[in-house]
């Protein structure tokens, strides 16, 4: 319909088909870009650490295969905080439930890179020592002492 109107009316034809300078297009795009932008994250409340812990404990309990365990681990460690020892324990139990020892070992590797210093890492290891022994999860440092 629009094409018929353009070609019927010579005045519209000349104004619509006329080349416009590039600066006008850039200004116009900039204005429209700012008008159309929205803040989607503004509508959500911030999640507390306790809510984060409860959510990931539940997700690790519900993980039914290796893909789900690794997906939840990836999401859990993508936040800008270190998961609680209870979450790490659930992650280890989920990895062993799906019978994947390498993922359980990688949980500790991820934890090592996530904590701020070596003392925090040692505190996590002390906290999770019984769980590690129960599930038979060695550390990478124990398996390959020369590479760490």
Swiss-Prot record:
Transit peptide location on this chain: 1-40
Domain of life: Eukaryota
GO annotation, biological process: mitochondrial electron transport, cytochrome c to oxygen; proton transmembrane transport
Record has Iron as a keyword: yes
Pathway: Energy metabolism; oxidative phosphorylation
Annotated keywords: Heme, Iron, Membrane, Metal-binding, Mitochondrion, Mitochondrion inner membrane, Oxidoreductase, Transit peptide
Molecular functions (GO terms): metal ion binding; oxidoreductase activity
SUPFAM superfamilies in UniProt: Cytochrome c oxidase subunit E
UniProt GO cellular component terms: mitochondrial inner membrane; mitochondrion; respiratory chain complex IV
Pfam families named among the record's database cross-references: COX5A
UniProt-annotated location(s): Mitochondrion inner membrane
Disulfide bonds: none
Main localization of the protein described in the UniProt heading: mitochondrion
Topology class, membrane: Peripheral membrane protein
Family assignment from sequence similarity: Belongs to the cytochrome c oxidase subunit 5A family.
Functional note: Component of the cytochrome c oxidase, the last enzyme in the mitochondrial electron transport chain which drives oxidative phosphorylation. The respiratory chain contains 3 multisubunit complexes succinate dehydrogenase (complex II, CII), ubiquinol-cytochrome c oxidoreductase (cytochrome b-c1 complex, complex III, CIII) and cytochrome c oxidase (complex IV, CIV), that cooperate to transfer electrons derived from NADH and succinate to molecular oxygen, creating an electrochemical gradient over the inner membrane that drives transmembrane transport and the ATP synthase.
Quaternary structure note: Component of the cytochrome c oxidase (complex IV, CIV), a multisubunit enzyme composed of 12 subunits. The complex is composed of a catalytic core of 3 subunits COX1, COX2 and COX3, encoded in the mitochondrial DNA, and 9 supernumerary subunits COX4, COX5A (or COX5B), COX6, COX7, COX8, COX9, COX12, COX13 and COX26, which are encoded in the nuclear genome.
More details: Present with 12500 molecules/cell in log phase SD medium.
Protein's name in the database: Cytochrome c oxidase subunit 6, mitochondrial
Organism from which the protein derives: Saccharomyces cerevisiae (strain ATCC 204508 / S288c) (Baker's yeast)
């Amino acid at each position: 319909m629009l094409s018929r109107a353009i070609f019927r009316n010579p005045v519209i034809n000349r104004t619509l088909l006329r080349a416009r300078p590039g600066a006008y297009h850039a200004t116009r795009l900039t204005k429209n870009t700012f008008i159309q932008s929205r803040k989607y994250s503004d509508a959500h409340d911030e999640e507390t650490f306790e809510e984060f812990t409860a959510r990931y404990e539940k997700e690790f309990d519900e993980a039914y295969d290796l893909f789900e365990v690794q997906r939840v681990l990836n999401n859990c460690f993508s936040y800008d905080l270190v998961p609680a020892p209870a979450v790490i324990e659930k992650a280890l139990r989920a990895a062993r439930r799906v019978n994947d020892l390498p993922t359980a070992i990688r949980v500790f590797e991820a934890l090592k890179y996530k904590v701020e210093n070596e003392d925090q890492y040692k505190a996590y290891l002390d906290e999770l020592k019984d769980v590690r022994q129960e599930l038979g999860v060695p550390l990478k440092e124990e398996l390959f002492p020369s590479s760490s």
